[in-house]
Amino acid sequence: MQISFHTDAFNSAAWSFEDALEWAQDHDVHRIECGVISGPNWLHGLGYHPHIALYEDPLTMKKKMADYGVQFSQIDAAYPLSGLNGPVRGVPYVLESIPWASHAGCPRIATTDGLHAPEKLSDEEAMTVMQRSYAQILEVAEQYGIHINIELHGYFTTNPDMLERMLNFVDSPYLGLNFDTGNTFISGQDPVDFLRRFVGDVNHVHIKDVSESLAAAARGEDTGIGISHCSIGEGVNADNIRECLKILRDNGYDGPLSLECEGKGGPVINKSLEWVRTTLDELDIPRE
């Protein structure tokens, strides 16, 4: 499996994307996941934001990353597609990201729904809106060979029955699942059972632990975790993560495992990386 990490880890440290590339090089990590910004942004322009902007030249970015020995596992264009603004803001955002990803050598784009039931839409109306949006997105993504992943993060995607319908919105090998160990847990689901049901759809994985205090305060109330402040392996979700890795192994998954946690400039994500590497070795899972 391919170890990756989400640059959200360094939001609070006000790092740039290149700072994140340097961290990856220093820690022998060769894949990276980040958010995408559409249009100028002052934090990004000043170098205080560890993500990429779509006005940056993708071929130049690809070369810079190669100099660090790093490539994209996925870019994150996860503006919620489930609400009234999904078609007018989310769809153009994803469509703009597709050719950029192709030129930058990024094979996947993450998408998702909103955290809560959308206002002014019934569940069925929202599902109809999303189906049209994903059909439009996949029509373009297929031409570029870019995989569109549905990330488990919101009201619909953490509901297994709704997710099953979403994964069948479009009959395409380019529509897949970004499984998230932390968001399934915080939503009140069992991550292990959830993964067993959908393991055949998994195209990218977020590895995220949950602190005891967050679990006590928010489990079954929230559907997603913005940033986990718990090192992977030190929270109440660690045993579930280990079992999920076994399921992925036994089903032939060899794709990215993207670490998601608060980095605090390094210490938290460093500990997380060590735990994931050790656990993969203990489970006889080859790693890159």
What is the predicted function of each stretch?
Residues 1-31, 63-68, 157-288:
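Histidine-acidic metal/acid-base catalytic patches
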Residues 9, 35-36, 76, 152:
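Residue-level recognition of beta-strand->loop/alpha-helix junctions
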Residues 9, 48-52, 79-88, 230-235:
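The substrate-binding groove and active-site-proximal loops of carbohydrate-active enzymes
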Residues 19, 25, 58-60, 64-74, ...:
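Active-site acidic/histidine proton-transfer and metal-coordination neighborhood
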Residues 33, 74-76, 110, 149, ...:
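Conserved beta-strand positions in the central sheet of alpha/beta enzyme cores
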Residues 33-60, 114-121:
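Glycine-rich, proline-tolerant flexible connector loops at the mouths of alpha/beta enzymes
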Residues 37, 80, 114, 210, ...:
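Flexible loop residues that form catalytic
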Residues 46-50, 88-90, 124-126, 164-166, ...:
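Short low-complexity, flexible loop/linker segments enriched in glycine and/or proline
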